[in-house]
């Protein structure tokens, strides 16, 4: 039986994140990245899905895309036995082909935990991927964490994070209340 994560007056029955969906320009390139670079397990494919009859607005009504958009195919990948990536390739008359930046509305990134950040960064460089800057050392509640962003071949942003000794927030008790008490005690001394 699944344990509900949230309290009353929130989404009933919510137990966690099921999958993350992303759209890519080339499914084979994405499959190579997810399987050969990240080590995901390929699960299965679906599609194509076409709704092109006059008056058929299923795609717009259900997915908020152009009514004539075609979902050419989608692949499912599992990472680390838990996270599922649902990866789409669309053809749409109004398709925007530039990935959003983090500062754009809808901008996003996927953060991946690694045990050895330096080894992971060296691996990404050896794979020919773009790593954005040098690893950053976090401060405050995230003290103990190092992180760096990198780009998938199609420009989607990913982040590597590592905090082998746990973050300060977690060492202080892992709740907002515990962190507030820790911060108050630190500033009082």
Enumerate the language-model features and the residues they cover.
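Long, charged/polar, surface-exposed segments that mediate recognition or autoinhibition
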Residues: 101-103, 122
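Vicinal oxygen chelate
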Residues: 1-13, 22, 85, 112, ...
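Generic short beta-strand segments
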Residues: 47, 90-92, 135-136
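Core segments of cupin and vicinal oxygen chelate
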Residues: 23-82, 119, 126, 138-139, ...
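A short, acidic/glycine-rich surface segment
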Residues: 4-6, 94-98
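Short, structured motif recognition centered on aromatic/hydrophobic residues
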Residues: 17, 24, 72-77, 82-87, ...
């Amino acid at each position: 039986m699944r344990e509900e994560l949230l309290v009353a007056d929130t989404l009933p029955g919510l137990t966690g994140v099921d999958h993350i969906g992303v759209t890519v320009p080339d499914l084979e390139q994405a499959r190579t990245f997810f399987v050969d670079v990240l080590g995901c397990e390929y699960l299965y494919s679906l599609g194509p899905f076409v709704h092109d009859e006059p008056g058929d607005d299923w795609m717009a009504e259900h997915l908020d895309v152009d009514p004539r958009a075609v979902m050419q195919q989608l692949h499912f990948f599992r990472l680390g036995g838990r996270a599922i990536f649902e990866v789409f390739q669309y053809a749409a008359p109004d398709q925007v082909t530039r990935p959003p930046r983090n500062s754009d509305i809808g901008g996003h990134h996927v953060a991946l935990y690694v045990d050895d950040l330096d080894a992971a960064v060296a691996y990404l460089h050896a794979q020919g991927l773009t790593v954005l800057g040098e690893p950053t050392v976090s401060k405050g509640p995230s003290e103990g964490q190092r992180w760096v962003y990198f780009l998938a071949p199609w420009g989607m942003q990913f982040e590597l994070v590592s905090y082998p000794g746990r973050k300060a927030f977690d060492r202080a008790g892992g709740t907002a209340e515990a962190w507030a008490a820790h911060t108050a005690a630190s500033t009082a001394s």
